Amino acid sequence: MFRKLNLYKCICLYKLKDKMETLPNEIARRGYLELILGCMFSGKTTYLVDTYNKLYSKFNIKVINYSGDTRYHSTMLSTHDKVMIPCIFTNTLSDVCEEKYLNNIDVILINEGQFFPDLYDTVCNLVEVHKKQVYVCGLDGDFKRAKFGSILDLIPIADNFIKLFAKCDSCGEKAIFSKRLTNENDQVVIGSTNYIPVCRHCYNN
């Protein structure tokens, strides 16, 4: 699994290291949305964990993960190489993002955003009404390269968009797609062993 995490990364628009560490007052007043997208094994959750580690000593953070994604731990958000941070598991974001739960929260990290049916409306409310700093990571397409949930709908309202890449499991080139290894046709089939990251050539051959 470690070889798959030899990542290619492309950060679009501008670098955010300083902003992530300080969250300037003007950002806090207006809200902020960052999207982290990519194929399987591209380091999306690792990026989210790194964001948490940069911010947790200065800000109150809520980490949310999809309840169906308990492959590595039942109460912690985990990367493929088992780096973990505390999180809340839920099927719908509205359950844990009501106003009464947000009073002391500065930053909200959402993992596997493509799975949440209420992602768009909830994130818009968090950023533009409650002025929270929200980071959402997820797949930019399913195994058929089709739109997955409503995560792509957030691009027009995002402050920043980051596209991550993996290493092709077949040839070693830059991977941009998730190829399913099993025969299920359902869009949602959770499990890292069911997929490999592949480049365009290997996806089509």
Locate the predicted segments by residue.
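Cysteine-centered motifs
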Residues: 10-12
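Conserved P-loop
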Residues: 21-96, 142-153, 166, 189-204
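Structural motif
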Residues: 35, 107-109, 135
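Short basic/glycine-enriched coil/helix segment immediately N-terminal to the Walker B
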Residues: 97-105
